[in-house]
Amino acid sequence: AQDYHIKSWATVLTRLTSFRASVSILGGSPVTKETDLLSPDKIVENIDGIVLAGGSAFGLDASSGVMDCLRDQNRGFDTGAIKVPIVPSAILFDLKNGGFKEWSINPYRELGQNAFLKVSHDFEIGSVGAGCGATTSIVKGGLGTSSLFYGDRIKVGAIVAVNSVGSPCFPGTNFLFSDLYGEKN
């Protein structure tokens, strides 16, 4: 889900049942929630969703919106008293992208809920969802995915939201480093 007025977004990954996940956190100032639970030595083996969002620390509220939706479905880690939806989140900085940021109520909880309600097997990549407000120096950042299948039972997928520092171009040119490695689109 994206909000073009604030130029920010949220992307949600979930399944009908809990699933295993891992994470790689990069960058000089990561904003995350519950990503430590993805280490193999933790008691929680499965999660209920993943959130990628903009908004710097404000964006952490997107996972609260997703947790609300999952709780409505009676999903989560069973503590014996209540089920707690496990929703690791990674957030990008997009507060300087020109969008409206003078809101009085944090919009990210609603963005998270909207993204959860729009979950489907097919989704867009690029400057949508987690890529809506992302930038990479002088060009747009975005959302990308990859997946592998091993037989009928094992499926491995990766999703990344790119909002990096530095230039994606050869110094003094408009030629992208990636031009050396892929097709031109």
Question: Language-model features: where?
Answer:
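Alpha/propeptide regions of enzymes that mature by internal proteolysis
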Residues: 1-185
